[in-house]
Swiss-Prot record, chains A, B:
It is found in: Lysosome. Residues 1-25 form the signal peptide. This is Beta-hexosaminidase subunit B1. GO terms for cellular component: lysosome; membrane. The keyword Signal applies. It catalyses: Hydrolysis of terminal non-reducing N-acetyl-D-hexosamine residues in N-acetyl-beta-D-hexosaminides. Its main location: other. It holds the Pfam family Glyco_hydro_20.
Length: 560, 560
C-alpha cells in the first residue's frame, strides 16, 4: 500500500515535471518558430530592445493616419492618461499628411486591467500588444506599468518617412507580442556622493531607465565623500555636503519618487552604514571613532573609508532616525522630530531598503579607548563582532518598520550564519558568492564589478551582455536570483560623462535581465542595439557609440 | 576763409574725439572703482558669467519671499510672459518658507521698452538691473532679449538655503548692473553632417547658448558626409542623409528657429558650397565632376572633399533653389516649387546666410571633359576662375534676395579684389587673415581653429579665453570685428560627447565676446567659471570639468 502510494506520488511528480517541460518546450518552439516563419531570420524581426518574451510577426506594413489616437477601452486613471499623452508626444513629433481610411491604423485600443499603481518589488509589467488592422489592434496590461512597457515597444515599431510625411509600421504585421520580464529586479545604481547630480539629471536617468525597460533606480545617496541628503531629524548632516547647493531637499526627493512612478521605476534608497561614513562626521563629529586619523599609529585608517563608531551615543539614534525618516515610518528616534505631517514618503517609497554594509575598515576602531571599553561592557571580543552587532540592529529595525533589507555581500561574508533570511544580498565581487548565498537560501541581486560596474575603461556592452547572473547557480536556487544592476560609482563620473558611461552598456544589462535566456545571445544584438541607441539619442539620452568611447569618425548612429 | 573753416572742422573733430575718450575713461574708471569700492576685491563681487559691462555692488543681503513675482510695469508681450515664467521656474525649484515683509524682496519690476522682437544681426541685448529693496528693484531692457540676458544675471545672483528653506541674494546689495555685449555676433557653430544631432539635442544646445549670453547658433547643416536637410524643391537631396531617420524636416527647422527666438538666439544657416559636396550627389549624381573618383589618375580627389561641378546643368538651379527655399524668399528656381504657402521662414530666418566656400579641391575637376569644354566656352582659364565665378554668382544671388553672405576665409584668399564688401569673412586659419581682411575693409567673424575649435584634445578654456579676436588689428578697423564663434566640427563628436566638448571651453569664448576687454583676464575667472559650470549642471547642461576631460576624482562642481 505504501509502495503503491509512493509510486502514485512518483508518477504524479513525473507527469508534472514532464508537463512543465513540454509547456516550456512549446513556448520556446513557438517563439523560435515565429522567429523563423516564412523563412524570416531573426534579423528580419522588428528591432525591439530588449527583445520581448514572445513575438509573432508577419510581413505586412501599415500607414498610421493623422487621426491616430490611443483609445482607452477600460477604466482609466490619471497616470494612464499621462503615460499615453507622453508616448503620443514622443512618437508624433513630425507633420503627418496621411488621411484615415480602412487601410490605415487609426487607433490603438488600450485595455488597463487593474488600477493598482503600487510600485513595489515584483510589480506586474507584463503586456500584450496586437497590431493587425485598424479594428483589431490593442495594447493590454494588468497594470499601467505594463502599458508603459508596451508603449515603449510600440514606439520602437514606428518609423517616419520624410519624403511623404507619413508614419508607418513596416514588414511585421500582423504582430502579436506577449511580453514580460525575466527577472523582477532590474536596475541601475547611481552614486550621488562622489559627485553630485542635479535633480534634472536624475530625472533624465529615470526617463532613460524606462526606455530600457529597467524598473529600479538604486540610489546610493550618501558616502564618505559627501552627505547630500537633507534630514529633518538630524539637520547638521548636510554640513557634510560638498557645498551649500549640492544637496537634495525633501522637495527634490519627492519629485524624484513621483517621476519614478510616472516611469515605472522603483526608487530604492541606500543609506550605507556603518562604513564610508566620513561625511556624517562633519555635522556630528562624535559619530567617528576617536583617534581614527591619528598619524602616529602604524595601522592607518583609510581616509575615505572610516566607519561610524557603534559605541558613540549618537550612532544608533542617527542611524535609526535616518531609516525611519527616509522610509516614511513614524518610528522616529529623535524626540525633536515629531512632525508627522511632514512625513516624506508614505506609500510611495520602495519596500526594499539598502543599508550598505560594505568595506567596514575595522582598523579605524583600533585607536579608540571608548570602543574598547564598550566592547568589554558588551562582551564583544572582536571588531567583527562589533560590526555584526551593529548591522543586526539595523536589519532588525528595518524589518520592524516593514522594509526588506538589502546589503552588499560583505555582510553575508561576515556573518551569514546569523543573518536573517529576509535579507537580500547584493553580489559585487564574484559569482562564487552568489552560488554560496543562494545555496544558503538567500535571495540575491547581481552587480558583479568586472561585468556590470560601468566606470572602468574596459566596461563595454558585449562584456556586460555575456554575463549571465544565474551562471552555475543550481536549478533549484535560480528563483533566488532576483535580478541585477549596472552600477555608476562616481569617483570618475559626473554629469558630463554620466550618460556615455551608462549607455550602451546598461542597455545590454537591460536585455540580459528582461529577455528570455535563449534569446539573449550576440546573434543579432549589435544592429538592434544600434537602432535602440539611435532611439535614445533621438530622445536626448546621450549614449556613447557601441565602442563605449567617443566617435572614431563620421558615422550614422545606425553604424556607431 | 577756407583755412578758418578747415580749422573749425579740425577743432570739432578734436573735441569729439576727446569727448569720446573722456567718456570712455570715466566709464572704465567707474567700473574699476566699483570693483574696488570698500576695499572689495573683484573676487568679492557676485560670480556672474560672463562678467557684466558695468557693475556696482554693496555688502547687504536680502531674503526673497515666497510671494515673490516679476511685475511687468510696461506693456507686455507673449514672449515676455513666457520668458519670465521660464526663469521663475528655473529659479524657484524648492520650497520657500519666507513670508513677505518690508525687509524681503517681494517683486522685481520688469520694464520692457520696445515690443520689437525681430532677431537679426545687431539686435539690442542691453539691460539694466537694479536690486536695492522691495520697492526699488527693477530689470529694464530695450527688447525682450535684453530682459532675457538680465534674467540670466538675476538667476546667477540667487542662492538657496537648504536648512531654513529660503532663497536669498548675498553680500552684494544695493546692486546696479548696466550690461551690454562687447561684440554683436557671439556664437557656436554646430556641424550636423558628420554626425546627426536630434532636434531635442539642438534645442538643448540653444538653451545652453542663452545661459552663456551667446546670441547665434551657426548651423553648418550639410557637408560631404551626409545631407540631412529635407528640401521641398529638390526632394532627392535627402537620399544623401545618413539614414531615413537622420533628417531635419521643415517642422524640425521651424521648431529650432522658434526655440532660438524664445532664447534670443539667431539661427544662422550654412549651406556649404561648392566644396564638400559628395552627399549632394546621392540624390543628384550629375552634380559632381565626371571622373572625380577615377582610380587610374595620378592626381587624386579626396573622397570627402569633392566639390560640385559648376558646369553641371543642375549646379546653379539646385544651389539657387536651396538659397531661396531656406532663406524664405520666393525666388525659387525650380518651376515645380511654387507652393508659397509652405514658405519656410518668412521673417524669422536670420539676415546672415553662410555659404561656406572652404576647401574647394580643384584637382577633383581635372578628369572632367565637360568642365574643360565649359571653361573654354566661358573663357575661364583656371579652376580658380571656375570657383570664383561660381561663388560670385552665389554671393550676388544672396544679396539679391536680401541676405548678407558669410563665407569662410578661403573665399577672401581666392579673390578678395573682386569680392563685394557686403560679404562677411569668417576667419579660421590665422589672425594674419583677420588683419588682412579688415585692412581691406571686410567685416570678419573670428573662429580660429587652434583657439576656438572645440574638438581637439588640446582645446581648453584657458587657451580659448586668452585669445583676443582684435589682436593686432588696427584701431580704425576694430569695428569690423563683429565677434566670433566656437566651432563643433563633428567627425569625432556626436550627441554623447557634445556638451562636454562644448563646455566649459565655449563659456570662456562667451565671456571673451561679451565682457569688457579690461575685465577679460584670468584674475578671477576660474572660480566664477566653476560656479557658472555648477549652474549649467543644475540645469542639465552637462559641461566637462575645467580640465576639459572626465573627472579625476570625487569633487564638488565648485572645485572641478
Amino acid at each position: 500500500m505504501i509502495i503503491l502510494k509512493r509510486n502514485i506520488v512518483f508518477l504524479l511528480i513525473i507527469i508534472i515535471v514532464l508537463g512543465i517541460f513540454i509547456a516550456t518546450s512549446i513556448e520556446i518552439k513557438n517563439y523560435k518558430l515565429s522567429l523563423n516563419q516564412n523563412k524570416n531570420e531573426i534579423s528580419k524581426n522588428p528591432p525591439i530592445w530588449p527583445a520581448p518574451f514572445y513575438g509573432q510577426f508577419g510581413n505586412n506594413s501599415i500607414l498610421i493616419s493623422k487621426e491616430f489616437n490611443f483609445t482607452i477601452i477600460s477604466d482609466s486613471t490619471l497616470l494612464l492618461n499621462k503615460t499615453l499623452s507622453k508616448y503620443y508626444n514622443l512618437i508624433f513629433t513630425q507633420d503627418n499628411l496621411i488621411n484615415s481610411s480602412s487601410n490605415t491604423l487609426n487607433k490603438l485600443n488600450i485595455n488597463l486591467k487593474s488600477k493598482n499603481e503600487i510600485l513595489k518589488f515584483g510589480f506586474d509589467e507584463s503586456y500584450k500588444l496586437i497590431i493587425k488592422n485598424n479594428e483589431n489592434s490593442k495594447l493590454e496590461g494588468n497594470t499601467v506599468y505594463g502599458i508603459m512597457r508596451g508603449l515603449e515597444t510600440f514606439y520602437q515599431l514606428i518609423k517616419y518617412n520624410f519624403s511623404d510625411n507619413s508614419y508607418f509600421i513596416e514588414n511585421c504585421l500582423p504582430l502579436i507580442i506577449n511580453d514580460k520580464p525575466r527577472f523582477p529586479h532590474r536596475g541601475v545604481m547611481l552614486d550621488t556622493s562622489r559627485h553630485f547630480y542635479s535633480v534634472d539629471t536624475i530625472l533624465k536617468v529615470i526617463e532613460s531607465l524606462s526606455y530600457n525597460k529597467f524598473n529600479t533606480l538604486h540610489w546610493h545617496i550618501i558616502d564618505s565623500q559627501s552627505f547630500p541628503l537633507s534630514s529633518k531629524s538630524y539637520p547638521n548632516l548636510i554640513n557634510g555636503a560638498w557645498s551649500k547647493s549640492e544637496i537634495y531637499s525633501y522637495h527634490d526627493i519627492k519629485r524624484i519618487i513621483k517621476y519614478g512612478k510616472e516611469n515605472g521605476i522603483r526608487i530604492q534608497l541606500e543609506i550605507d552604514m556603518p562604513g564610508h561614513a566620513k561625511s556624517w562626521s562633519v555635522g556630528y563629529p562624535d559619530l567617528l571613532p576617536h583617534g581614527w586619523n591619528d598619524s602616529t599609529t602604524t595601522i592607518k585608517c583609510p581616509d575615505y573609508d572610516v566607519p561610524l563608531d557603534p559605541s558613540s551615543p549618537l550612532s544608533l539614534p542617527i542611524s535609526f532616525g535616518l531609516l525611519s525618516e527616509f522610509s516614511g515610518t513614524d518610528y522616529g528616534y529623535n524626540p525633536n522630530y515629531d512632525d508627522k505631517s511632514n512625513n516624506l514618503f508614505n506609500l510611495t517609497v520602495d519596500d526594499l531598503f539598502h543599508v550598505g554594509g560594505d568595506e567596514i575598515e575595522y582598523q579605524c576602531w583600533n585607536n579608540s579607548k571608548r570602543i574598547k571599553d564598550w566592547m568589554n561592557e558588551n562582551n564583544l571580543k572582536t571588531f567583527q563582532d562589533v560590526a555584526k552587532q551593529f548591522q543586526l540592529k539595523i536589519i532588525k529595525q528595518l524589518l520592524k518598520i516593514g522594509k526588506i533589507p538589502v546589503l552588499w555581500e560583505d555582510t553575508f561574508q561576515l556573518f551569514y550564519k546569523d543573518l536573517p533570511k529576509d535579507v537580500i544580498v547584493e553580489i559585487y565581487h564574484d559569482q562564487s558568492t552568489a552560488i554560496n548565498a543562494t545555496n544558503n537560501g538567500y535571495k540575491i541581486i547581481s552587480s558583479i564589478a568586472r561585468y556590470w560596474y560601468l566606470e572602468y575603461s574596459y566596461s563595454n556592452w558585449i562584456r556586460a551582455y555575456n554575463f549571465e547572473p544565474t551562471l552555475n547557480i543550481s536549478k533549484s536556487n535560480i528563483h533566488l536570483v532576483l535580478g541585477g544592476e549596472g552600477a555608476i560609482w562616481s569617483e570618475s563620473i559626473d554629469s558630463s560623462n554620466l550618460f556615455q558611461k551608462l549607455y550602451p552598456t546598461s542597455s545590454a544589462i537591460a536585455e540580459r535581465l528582461w529577455s528570455p535566456i535563449y534569446y539573449t545571445n550576440l546573434l543579432n544584438a549589435k544592429s538592434r542595439l544600434q537602432s535602440f541607441r539611435c532611439s535614445l539619442l533621438k530622445r536626448g539620452i546621450n549614449s556613447a557609440p557601441l565602442n563605449n568611447s567617443s566617435p572614431l569618425s563620421a558615422f550614422s548612429c545606425y553604424n556607431s
